[in-house]
């Protein structure tokens, strides 16, 4: 709607309708000292001058080379992602409730669900969630519904922000959350096994984990199932070009953040979360599912189905109260996957792995620096420094290098640990520069 200011006649009519003589009389109850008479705002400016001012502000930003990950990653986004997702047919906050006029969006999201299932090795996916952290919380609540139990065991190597979101969702619901500290950046298998009881609904792990370590979760899945619990796996989608799928490891519910699939960092959002499971649990999936059907003429079509949200059914029977729509971000994820293709995703994952391995070897050879463990990694790894990692990272930032994520703020006793991330966008020269600056800072 265009902005249409009130005319003097509009103002007179409104004042007459409420029985007030003037605008001043309307605001008379507010003490004069509290009423603003003027505002410290500049006069209007031309478009050309405004652009000049904005460019000057942008010029004050310090360019840095980023080796920061921890959940959100600096991946290349093909131009086709912006081009297609920006088309008027897709670029909308509208939820496709009317299938007769939303077939394009519905089919695109149906293909998204298919892609997520193939990526994770699962059988069904919904049409997206808010982000990776809330997707993990939704998976936890789903496990509670499926099993009828009220206890969760979560590994300490799961992203600390995601763990906090799970606690926020569940703390006041009478759910017992047992957190098992990681051991040297890896899941403590004996402790996880010992924590399982006949009240445990699920075991929650992340792969690759927050430290960057990649583990085979198959044995943990078997142990969980033997105790009647589910395995929830949080994954990094790009890594699945190389890493064994969570479905193949025996996971019952798989979640993750889709930011790395064609969505920019953009100060932390927006993004989308994905969730996938087996057909057995399809009616417990939160959010919306796009289904394939036929119309009255026998033609193939797509519709929203199994919308077990509180807007559609009785609140106490709803699987979630998800309302806002992340479909545009999920669409970007689908376009990204379609543009790189199956073989391209493998190549992309291998490029991330290879560059990280080069960086790992280079940084690990610096005097006083060692790796947290010898487990395989994808594009993140944790190094142990002879100094406080936060102080070292701050010093390198002054040199134009965002060196990684210091762990002291998230894990007790790990003040000297730094998680370094190397995506396909980092060059050999940039990695060499990181090693040089790090060595100089020690």
From Swiss-Prot:
Gene3D superfamilies: Aspartate Aminotransferase, domain 1 (3.90.1150.10), Type I PLP-dependent aspartate aminotransferase-like (Major domain) (3.40.640.10). GO terms for molecular function: glycine dehydrogenase (decarboxylating) activity. Keywords: Oxidoreductase. It catalyses: N(6)-[(R)-lipoyl]-L-lysyl-[glycine-cleavage complex H protein] + glycine + H(+) = N(6)-[(R)-S(8)-aminomethyldihydrolipoyl]-L-lysyl-[glycine-cleavage complex H protein] + CO2. One of its GO terms (biological process) is glycine decarboxylation via glycine cleavage system. It comes from the Bacteria. It holds the Pfam family GDC-P. SUPFAM superfamilies: PLP-dependent transferases. Belongs to the GcvP family. N-terminal subunit subfamily. The glycine cleavage system is composed of four proteins: P, T, L and H. In this organism, the P 'protein' is a heterodimer of two subunits. HAMAP family: GcvPA. The glycine cleavage system catalyzes the degradation of glycine. The P protein binds the alpha-amino group of glycine through its pyridoxal phosphate cofactor; CO(2) is released and the remaining methylamine moiety is then transferred to the lipoamide cofactor of the H protein. This is Probable glycine dehydrogenase (decarboxylating) subunit 1. The gene is gcvPA.
């Amino acid at each position: 709607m265009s902005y249409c200011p009130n005319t003097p006649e509009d103002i007179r009519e409104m004042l007459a309708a409420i029985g007030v003589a003037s605008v001043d009389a309307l605001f008379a109850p507010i003490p004069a000292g509290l009423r603003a008479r003027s505002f410290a705002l500049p006069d209007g400016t031309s478009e050309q001058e405004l652009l000049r001012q904005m460019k000057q502000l942008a010029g004050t930003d310090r360019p840095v080379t980023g080796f920061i990950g921890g959940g959100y990653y600096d991946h290349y986004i093909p131009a086709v992602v912006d081009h297609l997702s920006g088309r008027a047919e897709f670029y909308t906050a509208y939820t496709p409730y009317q299938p007769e006029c939303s077939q394009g969006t519905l089919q695109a999201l149906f293909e998204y669900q298919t892609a997520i299932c193939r990526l994770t090795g699962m059988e069904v996916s919904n049409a997206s969630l808010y982000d990776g952290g809330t997707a993990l919380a939704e998976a936890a609540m789903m496990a509670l519904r499926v099993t009828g139990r009220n206890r969760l065991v979560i590994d300490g190597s799961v992203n600390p922000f995601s763990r906090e979101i799970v606690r926020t969702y569940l703390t006041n619901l009478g759910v017992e959350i047992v957190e098992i500290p990681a051991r040297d950046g890896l899941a403590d298998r004996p402790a996880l096994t010992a924590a399982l009881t006949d009240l445990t609904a699920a075991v929650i792990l992340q792969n690759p984990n927050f430290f960057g370590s990649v583990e085979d979760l198959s044995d943990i899945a078997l142990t969980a199932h033997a105790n009647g619990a589910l395995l929830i796996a949080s994954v990094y989608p790009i890594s699945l070009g190389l890493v064994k799928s969570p479905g193949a490891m025996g996971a019952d519910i798989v979640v993750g953040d889709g930011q790395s699939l064609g969505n920019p960092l953009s100060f932390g959002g927006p993004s989308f979360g994905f969730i996938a499971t087996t057909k057995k649990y399809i009616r417990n999936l939160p959010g919306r599912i796009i289904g394939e059907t036929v119309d009255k003429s026998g033609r193939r079509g797509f519709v929203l189905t199994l919308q077990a949200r509180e807007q559609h059914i009785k609140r106490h029977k709803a699987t979630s109260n998800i309302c806002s729509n992340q479909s545009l971000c999920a669409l970007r994820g689908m376009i990204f996957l379609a543009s790189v293709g199956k073989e391209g995703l493998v190549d992309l994952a291998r490029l991330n792995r290879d560059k990280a391995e080069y960086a790992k070897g280079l940084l690990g050879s610096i005097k006083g620096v060692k790796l947290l463990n010898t487990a395989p990694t994808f594009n993140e790894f944790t190094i142990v420094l002879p100094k406080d990692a936060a102080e070292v990272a701050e010093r390198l930032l002054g040199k134009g290098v965002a060196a990684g994520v210091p762990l002291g703020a998230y894990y007790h006793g790990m003040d000297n640990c730094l998680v370094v991330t190397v995506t396909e966008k980092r060059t050999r020269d940039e990695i060499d520069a990181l090693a040089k600056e790090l060595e100089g800072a020690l």
